[in-house]
Amino acid sequence: MSIISPQDVKKLREETNAGFGDCKKALSAAGGDFELAKKKLREMGIASAEKRLDRDAKEGRVFSYSNNIHAGLLLVSCETDFVALNHNFVNFGNSLIKELVESGRNSLATSQELELKNLAATIKENIQVKKIFITEIQSNEFVKIYLHGEQSKIGVLVKLKVDDFSKTEDKMLQDFAMDLALHVAALAPIYLRNDDVCPNYIKEQEEIFAKQLELSGKSESIVKGIVAGKIKKHLAEISLLEQGFVKNDKLTVREMLEEVSKAISSKIEIVEFKYLRIG
């Protein structure tokens, strides 16, 4: 039986980032063979990672990347905020979103799934890729990305289209695009425009509001008017274009788009947005 020295264990730890006990166990099982021990660690790690999948992973962070052809956001969860700051965790997320954006993929390849399991084994937490959003940047489009705070617990991507693409160099447009991303981070709209809201959802809300007014004693026509007003207000809360702009709530986002379009002499359109949040 091979004698496993502390120096051997230290060397394996430095090469794999695995724990002392796991390294010692792997070396013993491999008879002191370093390459075999690494394989044993991977096998042990994947098994233990799968056992951790039922543990809550309510922390994490959002990662982003853009290469002017595609852009994307990635939400990776973990169990503790301490791990969300771990350099191995951060490096994994940054590398993964770059690979996904550069390939245009919105799902993990087998090799990437294995990397995820190995990371979970090394850090010893339930780590999961929760959400992937990749978008293609078409002609006359550009994106603005905002990550909130040191731990990037909120990530926003806004894609805009400009009739005159040379205007994307305009500071007013760039500032407005960033303000839009900040707006989405602050108010978390669900839809871009009212037309995107499911008609069945609107009907359900109308029924709820009408039910609330059943005992009001008001006439049917007045109730209909009140319900219509409540629906309009509700849609303004969940639709980006109808929300009061975060830096000037006297104007809606739609009206701000028109104002900036006039100022730079080029029509601006919000093509889409994405909001990701930990928790």
Swiss-Prot record:
GO terms for molecular function: translation elongation factor activity. The keyword Cytoplasm applies. GO terms for cellular component: cytoplasm. Pfam families: EF_TS. Residues 80-83 are annotated as: Involved in Mg(2+) ion dislocation from EF-Tu. Keywords: Cytoplasm, Elongation factor, Protein biosynthesis. InterPro entries: EF-Ts_dimer_sf, Transl_elong_EFTs/EF1B, Transl_elong_EFTs/EF1B_dimer, Transl_elong_Ts_CS, UBA-like_sf. Its main location: cytoplasm. It is found in: Cytoplasm. Belongs to the EF-Ts family. Associates with the EF-Tu.GDP complex and induces the exchange of GDP to GTP. It remains bound to the aminoacyl-tRNA.EF-Tu.GTP complex up to the GTP hydrolysis stage on the ribosome. NCBIfam families: tsf. This is Elongation factor Ts. The lineage of its organism: Bacteria, Pseudomonadati, Spirochaetota, Spirochaetia, Spirochaetales.
